[in-house]
Amino acid sequence: MRVVFMGTPDIAATCLNKIIEKGYEIVGVYTQPDRPKNRGMKLAFSPVKEVAIAHDLPVFQPENFREEETVEQLRQLKPDVVAVVAYGRILPQKVLDIPEKGCINIHASLLPAYRGSAPYQWAVLDGLKETGVTAMYLCREMDAGDMIDTAKTPIGENETAGELLDRLAVLGAELLDKTLQGIEDGTVQSVPQDHSKATYAPMLDKTMCPIDFTKTAQQVHNHVRGMNPWPVATMELAGKRFKVYETALLSQSSTAAPGTVLGLSKQGLQLACGEGVIEIRVLQAEGGKRMAAPDYFRGHPLEL
């Protein structure tokens, strides 16, 4: 079975590694064009391109599939199936129609919940206890195709979005392998999504960073976890702006105004929330290094 793989970030690279390891006939790898990265702004390969090159797989990096020449190039690869994982491009119908066995996708949520570009981040932001990955057929509408299979996993109470993604990548790779096996031997089945239950997970942006201490301590904790590793939660304190990477829920309560500093323990800085108390464990002052909160405030004492 001839497979074309399409993907770009780390989760996709994990999936590509898996199907290489399993010995599928991969006739082409599509990934986004090289982009400038870091302060030097040198062009950098995507994680998927790195994997493809390491295994001598042909790499294609079109900006889009608007040109007929680009579509024909894919057609000439004669794929039986196209496997898509976080490619970052919407595929037009003329591309979806090319592989005889369809275009499949691994999506990092339990569809129809959290359609969109930031599903695992929103699962953490919303305080979900469980999420997973879904294998589905691609259609013209975003993340709305028929579902083939799912795999579930609990979300740890202190787990960040980045940590969750690392686990979902492994889960997704296993599900992709299982799905391709089912397609190859003709046993795969699918069911339509219940579109009435669809929810959406739009891309995060830096306007969402500031912590709202009028919310409950649990909501603040979820916010910090969901925004880690990007774009990272922030707070203002004593005229300075801090990035906040790690927090802990405390069992105590407080009648102080939300955002009030209650004290500094050996573990972190304690602040009042709309309900409950949150402890800031790891932070980074603007222009400074990421460090444990007690270490920072020993060198920069607060007036409590």
Model-derived features: positions:
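Donor/substrate-binding cores of folate-linked one-carbon enzymes
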Residues: 21-22, 32, 81-200, 207
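N-terminal glycine-/serine-/threonine-rich beta1-alpha1-beta2 phosphate-ribose binding loop
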Residues: 36-78
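Short beta->alpha connector loops
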Residues: 8-11, 63-66, 87-90
